[in-house]
Amino acid sequence: MPVIWLIDAYRAGERGQVRALADALGWPCETKTLRYRKHVVLPHVLGRTTLRGIDAASAASLQAPWPDLVISSGVRNEPVCRWIREQSGGQARYVHVGRPWASLDSFDLVITTPQYRVPEEPNVVNNTLTLHSITPERLAQARREWAPTFQALPQPRIAVIAGGDSGPFTFGAGAAARLGREAS
């Protein structure tokens, strides 16, 4: 059985995609939650291989035996994942989910979506949609759970799935209310 580390992403959408991939693999995984140092930007921007962006306790949690596979997302985690792969003597494979910030040869595999315009390369999988944990069983459970709430609403019904904040774009209560009005 392979040893898999999930380097927990710091944003909910990224975290969900990492966990969805882990769930799909069906193997046990160990989640490593990192705390980031404030005002440390250069390792991420410059594509370095370092632990400089995380605090000492987080760095101390990353020790041998090294994993066979590291799955992560987010620019802050990239230098750390490269460091893990380097410490393993190159044995740990690094899968990055979402937008890659470093050069593509920094990753063993990138699983991304079209909005990031990642070039086609042998180590890039470009999915139509983001990874998720929605299964037929979860949909059936939600249907049973929510049927009484929606039963009285007029048909046809339209569902809108919207993400959260992304960089300078925020999705607060006002934006959600406006989306609801405009979708009705």
What are these regions (language model features)?
Residues 1-5:
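Extreme N-terminal starter segment of soluble prokaryotic enzymes
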Residues 105-174:
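A nucleotide-sugar donor-handling region in carbohydrate enzymes
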Residues 6-7, 11-132:
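Active-site and donor-binding regions of nucleotide-sugar-utilizing enzymes
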Residues 184:
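A conserved nucleotide-sugar
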Residues 173-181:
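Charged helix-capping and loop-helix junction motifs
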Residues 20, 83, 141-148, 181:
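Charged/polar, solvent-exposed surface patches and flexible loops
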